Amino acid sequence: MNKIRKTFQYGKHEVTFETGEMARQATGAVVVRMGDTVLLVSVVAKKEAEEGRDFFPLTVNYQEKTYAAGKIPGGYFKREGRPTEKETLTSRLIDRPLRPLFPKGFTNEVQVIATVLSVDSKVPTDIPAILGASAAIGLSGIPFNGSLGAARVGYRGGEYLLNPSLDELKDSALDLVVAGTRDAVLMVESEAQELPESVMLGAVLHGHQAMQVAIQAIAEFIQEAGGAKWEWEPPTVNTALEKWVVEKSEAPLKKAYQIQEKTARQAQIQAIRDQLLADRAAEREGEENAVNEHELAVIFHELERRIVREQILTGQPRIDGRDTKTVRPITVKVGVLPRSHGSALFTRGETQALVVTTLGTERDAQSIDDLDGDRQEEFIFHYNFPPFCVGEVGFMSGPKRREIGHGRLAKRAVVPVVPTLDKFPYVIRVVSEILESNGSSSMASVCGSSLALMDAGVPTKAPVAGIAMGLIKENDKYAVLSDILGDEDHLGDMDFKVAGTSNGVTALQMDIKIEGITKEIMEQALDQAKEGRLHILSIMNKVLDKPRSQVSDLAPQYVTMKINPEKIRDVIGKGGVVIREITEATNCAIDISDDGTIKIAAHTTEEGEAAKRRIEELTAEVELGKVYEGTVVKITDFGAFVQILPNTQGLVHISQIAQERVENVRDYLEEGQVIRVKVIEIDRQGRVRLSMKQID
């Protein structure tokens, strides 16, 4: 295979695609370079599909190699381990726009692997990874309705930034990734600083327009490489069986989809499906391969899809009886757990999230070591989706890709309103436990987390709410749905999640399964989402509309003080012995900054004040004329040495012990005795002279 190379200018960066030199046994492979960021993206597809498979087994793996940043992995084995959260999220980011471009009925197993070989700190890896995946699939000849482009968009000073660097993103009010084809936007993932809907939509359109140069370059690159296309035909529909299924099941299915309660509806649909199989087996008894369950299931699913969609497009009530704009009934409770620092129970229809906020010290921050460098994460968000929340039995293990993705979306939504560590000295962990799910559990997590944070006394800028929107579109007819159910998400054409405050959008996520989504449709979806979001906020605000005035008594209590930086060594002690003794005695965590700022985190105010007193004693300067209570540590013929501060001793001369003449010091003092003394002199060498007789 000849080496093929294609270079084009993409914003401020030059992008290069190469094929024919690396990974030549893969079905398709591309080395993509953007700045000094280099990735190898490979795709391998099985030639034959597994018989009876009714889904498309696409796997996307994004992996970062530490050598890409000139680093050696930590740990005992010194090699990369299981995927990090960033790797999982980037894998999902690549997967989401690719999946809808594979043709319906294509069920061959496909694996895309994007490996980071070199990383440029100015160029995030996700955009070249998506571009490389698009090019590699195009080269492979697999059935694919591409090419796919991607762009990152920032917003600063009223202007959009194309593919901003990591440094530019720090000053940007927006971090938005958009992917799509020449004619359609397919995926959006974003975080924003309470921006108007018009700015968000403008960013999506700006990114889609800007990515056209990348889409064109990928198409030219694939054409130049000239790979052979797969000979693949979509499975034919058994029209006779289709007609039979419709006759048998359409009427009962329509009736079933009028059952508003999810579990009862699913049970009825399963009963119809089981009866259909039994009827088919009875009619074809004695025939070889009498019942093709896979074929029957595909037709039955298409019938379900048509019934639900027609019902909505003809203006009939939705599955649960609502119109297109109505949000399900909402109930809100806060402070539901007695020993947590903050908690909320948010229920919207048959979706319920129990969200808990825990406040910790700086030592509780999450340490992250990846290709971007070492850093501390002070705001942690975890989302859990146990099997019981959908009435299923399932294997309990670590978080799955979906849970990590939903948790990150909810985190994006609330991060813009959460104070930084310098304004609120706590590390914050939020956990969302999904207890019931029938659509939009990530947005329930957003609402619940906002309430739980305020219940914990975290001074958030404003309450945040989220809503999931859907779309049903057939030709020129369409309906935008507010607060979608799980079935509407599954059977619809778009999943469009918007979160924000009353002032603007903080997070936007969009996944579109079809082409033909116009600017007008997206505008309507955003406007309708705003209406729903404000409605949800109004209900939340009736229960809790601002943060508690103080944090929970159960949370760590912070005491902050400042000392002379030269005294830090006195507080720490040799080998840390002094500070360790203070923390053990007072049950506190103590953090000392180089500028002398000390933060004491205690379980109670009393423990914090005790630690503060100990440090004040250690770092106090002796004051001339001040009376101290000290302990006699040594007696000599000429006087006694008295410990007046932890690191300071002074001499009480024999002439300063009493008003009368003292012949023997031991007649008046003994070692270990506690006495009151006055500082009468501090000489140039810092030596302290004390007096007992000059005390009034």
Swiss-Prot record:
PROSITE patterns: KH_TYPE_1, S1. GO terms for cellular component: cytosol. It is found in: Cytoplasm. One of its GO terms (molecular function) is magnesium ion binding. Keywords: Cytoplasm, Magnesium, Metal-binding, Nucleotidyltransferase, RNA-binding, Transferase. Its cofactor is Mg(2+). The keyword Transferase applies. Involved in mRNA degradation. Catalyzes the phosphorolysis of single-stranded polyribonucleotides processively in the 3'- to 5'-direction. This is Polyribonucleotide nucleotidyltransferase. The lineage of its organism: Bacteria, Pseudomonadati, Pseudomonadota, Gammaproteobacteria, Legionellales.
